[in-house]
Amino acid sequence: MLEVVHLTKIYKAKGGVETKALNDVSVRFPEKGMVFLLGKSGSGKSTLLNVCGGLDSPTSGEIIVKGRSSKNFSQSDFDSYRNTFIGFVFQEYNILNEFTVEDNIALALELQGKPKDKKAIRQLLDDVDLSSFAKRKPNTLSGGQKQRIAIARALIKHPEIIMADEPTGALDSATGK
């Protein structure tokens, strides 16, 4: 389903100093189940997720999605991959404060070219215990509530894979479970 082969990512600072965030990483992710990446801060976990998710480009190596190399992806292929195949939950929520909670979730559907599904959005808001906040703006919510919006936004797309970078970091212990 998803595999990375000999993936290397090097960042170049303005002074010309290179930082190798990923060094010849190869991983085959299972079709089902959960995979957890563990490591110290700065060890490349977030970089790996960003590259696997098509949000950043590798310096070398390739990503293989359902047997097809990302080296052969057009921009349209990458857009489709990010909007339908992958769901993201980041450490930073990337919630739009100008939108209501429900409109932040609906945005994921809009990016897929799908209509706003109010019933599905209401169900997800109920699932993440945010039903009473549907019409509120995110800037009035706690960090944990914003994180739950991000989780609901990833789930509404029904992606084949959800990539989460510390998705429970802002949640209290009861909600995180």
Describe each PLM feature range.
Residues 2, 7-177:
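ABC family nucleotide-binding domain
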